[in-house]
A protein has these predicted regions:
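N-terminal secretory signal peptides that target proteins for export/translocation
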Residues: 1-4
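Exported/periplasmic ABC-transporter solute-binding proteins
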Residues: 21-99, 104-294
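Bacterial N-terminal signal peptides
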Residues: 8-19
Length: 294
């Protein structure tokens, strides 16, 4: 009788414990916001990376901001933002790039390599340029498309704003001692350059390949249909297009690094996100837009 009573009490206690467990709420991790600012050239890949990361960790919220590489690096030196996306080469005395105050505290993690695509309107008959021709165009020495083998018509220049990593690269690799003509239309983001060129048959501009990845001739994923429907045309430069292969091998003339920058060694959630970006899954996402680093 006593044994039976003990068994009943044990069953009752176990049932009560199960009910209590079922009614208990599963603890949800508190939301965490990570702010990333900087390069607009990296906006497409960062959007894809953060979307993928949030699907794995729903409590992580990303606040993506622009501002450009130069302003982004200045802001993170001052302790603002969790991460900055930048396409600027690190300071190097051998190249004349001196380190601003506070730069020694920055940690640059390379995540990929970008190439600047030279774009024109699809109706433009010009398909290829040399670096010298590109410099002459943007310095204002060449004013008419007819001089380049195209139809007669004024050349409309579209450039990025001062401080943009894309503009800095363009000025260093293309312009040299020359200056971009003051007649150039200045746009704040790469997407704005694409939109302007797409709407102006006389325009020429330069943008990150991320904004033209589906329309690059010679790219493995580019289809004939995509080229036919592309809003802009990517030009050959010195006989090469900015494909992932030519960019990764540094065979294309206008390449630049892609960095995620922290003030001090990355830690905690920031470290975990960077680890994801460098993982096979993250690098596969980077490869949709740029040349991956791994």
């Amino acid at each position: 009788m006593l044994d039976r009573l003990v068994r009943v009490l044990l069953l009752f206690g176990l049932s009560a414990l199960l009910v209590a467990c079922e009614g208990a709420a599963v603890a949800t991790p508190p939301p965490v916001t990570l702010t990333i600012a900087g390069s607009s050239s990296m906006a497409p890949v960062l959007t894809a990376l953060t979307d993928a990361y949030t699907r794995q960790y729903p409590n992580i919220v990303f606040d993506l901001r622009g501002g450009g590489s130069t302003l982004g690096e200045a802001a993170i030196r001052a302790g603002r933002y969790d991460l900055v996306a930048s396409t600027l080469f690190p300071p190097d005395p051998d190249t004349g790039r001196s380190a601003p105050p506070g730069d020694e505290a920055l940690v640059r993690t390379p995540i990929g390599i970008d190439g600047l695509a030279i774009i024109v309107h699809p109706s433009n008959d010009v398909d290829a340029l040399s670096l010298v021709q590109l410099r002459d165009i943007f310095s204002g020495s060449v004013l008419n498309w007819q001089a380049l083998g195209g139809d007669a018509g004024e050349v409309v220049l579209v450039s990025r704003e001062d401080g943009s990593g894309a503009r800095i690269l363009f000025e260093e690799r293309v312009m040299g001692e020359e200056r971009v003509s003051l007649t150039a239309v200045v746009m704040p983001t790469s997407q704005d350059v694409v939109d302007y060129v797409a709407g102006n048959p006389a325009a020429i501009g330069y943008v990150s390949r991320a904004h033209t990845a589906a329309w690059i001739p010679g790219e493995a994923v580019t289809t004939t249909a995509a080229l036919a429907e592309a809003p802009v045309k990517v030009l050959e430069l010195e006989g090469r297009w900015p494909t992932r292969e030519t960019v990764a091998a540094q065979q294309y003339g206008l390449t630049q690094p892609l960095y995620l920058i922290t003030r001090g060694a990355p830690a905690g959630r920031v470290r975990q996100f960077i680890d994801f970006v460098l993982s096979p899954a993250g690098q596969a996402i980077v490869a949709r837009y740029h040349a991956p680093i791994r």
